[in-house]
Structure formats: structure tokens, C-alpha cells
Amino acid sequence: MFNKKNREIYKKIVEEQHYCQLCGSTCWLEIHHIYYRSQGGNNDERNLIRLCKKCHELVHSNKKKWQKFLLEKQHIKYGEFDEKDLRN
């Protein structure tokens, strides 16, 4: 559901992440859920990362590999957190 809180979180991600967090591209940027919504992933900002269209497709081609890598990246950025907080 895209309520006011979710819009604010997405806006923050867009404002803070001006480039793909994998390759550095500034073209065709999208927001990716590290824990997919189909896995119960929520819109916690630690579960969201900005990727270009090409990297977004790459990440979706090998979920497990990239999920682990992106979670490690988020732990570096945000410090330690319980990954259960990223799921509903």
C-alpha cells in the first residue's frame, strides 16, 4: 500500500541515492526491495535500494546471491539491525 509514510520513505531514498548502488549509473533508476514483497518484504528504508534498470534485472536473475550481497551493503550503511524488521 502506498500511503503517506511510504511516499516519504521512497522520496528519501530518491533524494539520498542519486545513482545505482551497484554500478554507479545515473540512468533509469528504480527502487528495489531487498526482501521482495512476495517474501513479506516491507518498505523499511533498510529494505530499499536504488538500482539502474540493468542491475535491477541482474539482481532479479539470482535472488539469493544478490539478496545476501545487498543485505551486507545495507548493514555497512545502517549498522547492525534485525533483518526480521524488513518483513511484515
Placement of each model-derived feature along the sequence:
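Short Cys/His-centered divalent metal-binding micro-motifs
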Residues: 28, 48-69
